[in-house]
Structures are given as structure tokens and as C-alpha cells.
Amino acid sequence: MSSLPTSDGFNHQAHPSGQRPEIGSPPSLAHSVSASVCPFKPSDPDSIEPKAVKAVKALKASAEFQITFERKEQLPLQDPSDCASSADNAPANQTPAIPLQNSLKEAIVADNLEKSAEGSTQGLKSHLHTRQEASLSVTTTRMQEPQRLIGEKGWHPEYQDPSQVNGLQQHEEPRNEQHEVVQQNAPHDPEHLCNTGDLELLGERQQNQPKSVGLETAVRGDRPQQDVDLPGTEKNILPYGCFGCSSSETFMEIDTVEQSLVAVLNSAGGQNTSVRNISASDLTVDNPLMEVETLKCNPSSEFLSNPTSTQNLQLPESSVEMSGTNKEYGNHPSSLSLCGTCQPSVESAEESCSSITAALKELHELLVISSKPALENTSEEVTCRSEIVTEGQTDVKDLSERWTQSEHLTAAQNEQCSQVSFYQATSVSVKTEELTDTSTDAGTEDVENITSSGPGDGLLVDKENVPRSRESVNESSLVTLDSAKTSNQPHCTLGVEISPGLLAGEEGALNQTSEQTESLSSSFILVKDLGQGTQNPVTNRPETRENVCPEAAGLRQEFEPPTSHPSSSPSFLAPLIFPAADIDRILRAGFTLQEALGALHRVGGNADLALLVLLAKNIVVPT
């Protein structure tokens, strides 16, 4: 390969025309704008000049840039056609990364360099840190040049189509030399583009401070020794066309002392490198986005497909938002993506009692809890049907309603909760024996271990001796009442059911009256003979039996009044009359009238939720 000597005494590598120096670089990284440095490894550590000499060269280069700008900033902007023609006149065999040698501007610089080198370098400092023992050279950023726009002002590298960038890479010409972005002041290796352990910090520049091509050409001509080969990821996004100049933002003072050097441990090579932090003075508040990417360069010019994220990167205090580049540069999971705002909080689950989702969720939780063995294995779970006849002294009519065994006091009890309060029982364990002898005179079942609290836990239930299919009683940590499964013999069953939660087999997750049932969780029910002249142990009033529900009355058999259960405080239960259409709808779904009435009572007349309760009874949670 040929080398082109420059005024700084170093031979810069010359690439053939059309050849890209970033061999192996992923095309998707071409959107990045170089905002920092790419260190290079010198081929011979002995060729590195002493630090003092390099510092002098850096100061002289700064002086050249300032002098050139002061001379050229008053010049009119160059026409785009002039820019294109001057760029097209570049030699065809010169690499796109090497600036044009302008002898006229070099003479101007040489004439003025010694006169104002010391006075014009104030505010522009550059410190070169050299590690000769490790053969690593970390170059510092010369200046943060204003953002350039391609063609028109609306161009932004983030929104540019990848196909346009690919076309730019394929048809790039030597005039790219006049639009290089990064100025570097350290020698580079003609044989190696980048060191293995070096990282390159890429970021967006300001978009609203363009610079004229005339000034750019002047700067390139005055300081050819400061221009080095750039990776394709920096070069391919360089704009064409004419640029404006902002005199107020001419120089962005770069004080490398204020810039933080972030030490990044290279996991592949194990070498410590330094990446340059973007100074706060290089960013303005109106710059909404800054893409930060680090690229790992190796001697074989192969770039790491996943950019290494710099964890210790310190950002300026201005409102700069770091955005991920997965969409722009392909799927790079290591891309640095920092958000200025925290993630939105997760919405809380809907606590509405009428929500089917909440009902199913509650059902699942209760079934999982109830699957734990908390009680002795009971024999069978059946459905209780109760007829509550509460005859008021004024206008309370005789009523008969059916209740499933585990149903709670619902809206009917809500109306009377000011008179009677049912408190949650802590523990009720009811174990009943199944009566197989059809000649049992009383037909009662033994009720054991009844421990409940609250004034309303002693109510009785009227149970129908209809055989029920066996359900999973091992899942239930609550009370299950066993009915005598005799054919024609009436039996009296006394039982107290406690539902601290919901009964596993039958309780759907219906919390429509969850607030009420928390304080009314002890299920009432009443087993009594509805014969004439019998006294209700709950209300202590005489009561008569009327056929309020004809179908239920047809199936009802007389039960002997219980003698072992004490009477509790009075309870006035106002019934709910449900629409026939809702009952028919549940019956058409394959459920019995008893189940339909019980479910409607439980959910306060909501047919949808009642149907859901009945369907949820069939859910079995595997243990």
C-alpha cells in the first residue's frame, strides 16, 4: 500500500479509489455520528514522539484552526455547485478519509502560525495520553463541530432510510474528504485502523448549527496533519451540499481536563481503554436525542456486531434522552438505551365485584388455598335447599327460597344488616355421618365440632334429600354438610357452614358482595319442620307453609324440627324476586332450578354472574 506524507511527518495510509477502509463493518452501523475518538495503535512504539512535542503540535493545530476560521468566517457561503465541483476535482487515487492538500491554504497557515500560535490557543486545550508500554494511543476529541445537514435542513441520521445510506456507501466519491466530522491530533498506524481494546463513542451532534463548505475546505487545507482515516461508520453519514455558519457557535471549547475518561475493561482482549465523554458544553438543551454507541475495533478491521455499552458514561445535566438503536441499527441487544422517565406503573387489577376476570382470579386463588389439607376428609358434599319463611307482623309474606350449601348472605341480608350482623366465624368444622338405615326414626345426623362466632351462626337449613354427585371434598378447607342419601325417608340435618373465603367446589369468585360477605361470612341456615303450628327457632313466631315456589314445594318433604340447635338472634330476610327470563336462561344452560335460585341469590340477581358461579363449580385445581 502506498502512503501519502503530510506536514505532520507521518505517513497516512492511502486506500485505492472506491475501497472502504471499514472492511467488515456492519452496514447497519453507518447511521451513527462520531462524537468522540477512535484510538489507534502505532506500528512502532519508538516512533512516538515525546509528549511535550506532541502537546506543542496540538496547540499549533488549534491555533491554525482558529486563525483560519477568523479569516474565513466573513466570507460568503459557498455555492453547493462550487462545493461539488471542488470535491469532484479530488484525485481518484486518494482515499476518502485523507483531506485534500491545499498548498495555498498551507502557505497561509505557515505564514500566520508563528505569529499568533500562543495567543489564539486559549480555551482550546488538548492533552494526549500515551501508553508506550502497552502500545496504546488514546486520542482526544479536537472539537465538537456543529451538526451538518444533508442537502436540506430536515435531514437526521436517525430518520434516514438504510437503503439511502447503503447507496451513499456504494457511490461515495473523493469529495467526502471535505466533510469529515472528527478532528484528531495523534498519529495512527498505517497498518491497523483500530486497536482491539479501543472503543469508539458515537453520538449525535447538534442539528441546528451548520457550517459552510468554504470554511470546511479551509480548515481541511490548513490542518491536513490533523486529519486521519475514519471508520466507515463515521464517514458514510457525512453530508453533501452547502452548509450555513453560526458565528455564535464557532468554537465549542473542549477542555479535556473537564471531560471524564471512562475506563472500560475489554472482556475480549482484557485491555483497559478510555473513551471520551461528551462534554456538557457540546450539547444544547434543544438537542432531544443523543445516540451513544461504542464500537470495538480490531486490527483486522472487523467491528463487533453488538456495540459495547459504556456503563460508566456520564451524561450532561441537560435534558438529553438516550434512545436505543435496535430499530435503526438492527437487533443489537447491547445497545445503550437509557430513558429519562421511569416506566409507567403497572395498572392494578380491577376490584369490581361484577368483573368476570376478577371473579375467575379470586376463584383460582381460593381453590389453590382450599386445596391444602386443613380438615379431615369428609364423605360427600351436597347441595342444601332451604326455605326461609319469615313472616313479619305486618306485611311480610310467606316465602320459600332455595339456597346452595355454601351461599352467602347477599342483598337480601344487606337490607337487614342494620338489624342483624353476621360476623365471620373463625373456624367451623362440621362432620356428619351418612345414614344408610332407611328406618331411622328421626333421621338426624350427628354434628360435631361446631365452633363459630357471631350472633347469626346458629341458623338452620332446610335440606332436600336429593342425592348429589360426589364432588372433590379434599379440596375444601371449609365446611361440607353431608346429607343422608336415603330414598324416601325424610331426614333432619343440622349444620353450620363457615366460609372465611369461598367454598372450594361451589364458590365462584363472585365478590359482588365481598364487602358485605366479609362481615356476613357465617352462612345461616335452617332445618325445620314446616308443619302447621311449629315455631320458628329463629324468629320465635308461628309460621305456615305456602306454595310460593310450586316446583320446590312439589319436591319438598316434611322434616322433623331440630331439638339440638339453639335459637339465635332474630333475622329478617327480605327475599329477592328474580325475573323468569334470567331463571330460564340458567335452566337452559343445564342447571337445576335450585342451583339457579341459589346462584342468583348469591350474586344479587345478576344472571351473568350467577351463571359464572355455576360454571365455576366444575373447575378443579390439580394438586
From Swiss-Prot:
Stretches with biased composition (Polar residues): 1-16, 83-99, 133-144, 474-491
Entry GO CC: Golgi apparatus; nucleus; plasma membrane
PROSITE patterns: UBA
Region annotation (Disordered) ranges: 1-48, 71-99, 116-189, 433-493
Compositional bias (Basic and acidic residues): 150-159, 170-180, 460-473
Tissues showing expression: Renal outer cortex and outer medulla, small intestine and liver.
Alphabetized UniProt keyword annotations: Cell membrane, Golgi apparatus, Membrane, Nucleus, Transcription, Transcription regulation
Every UBA domain range: 577-617
Location(s) in or outside the cell: Cell membrane; Nucleus; Golgi apparatus, trans-Golgi network
Complex formation: Interacts with YRDC.
Biological role: Mediates transcriptional and post-transcriptional regulation of SLC5A1. Inhibits a dynamin and PKC-dependent exocytotic pathway of SLC5A1. Also involved in transcriptional regulation of SLC22A2. Exhibits glucose-dependent, short-term inhibition of SLC5A1 and SLC22A2 by inhibiting the release of vesicles from the trans-Golgi network.
PANTHER family associated with the record: DNA DAMAGE INDUCIBLE 1 HOMOLOG 2 (PTHR15397:SF3), SODIUM-GLUCOSE COTRANSPORTER REGULATORY PROTEIN -RELATED (PTHR15397)
The protein's name in its UniProt record: Regulatory solute carrier protein family 1 member 1
Protein source organism: Sus scrofa
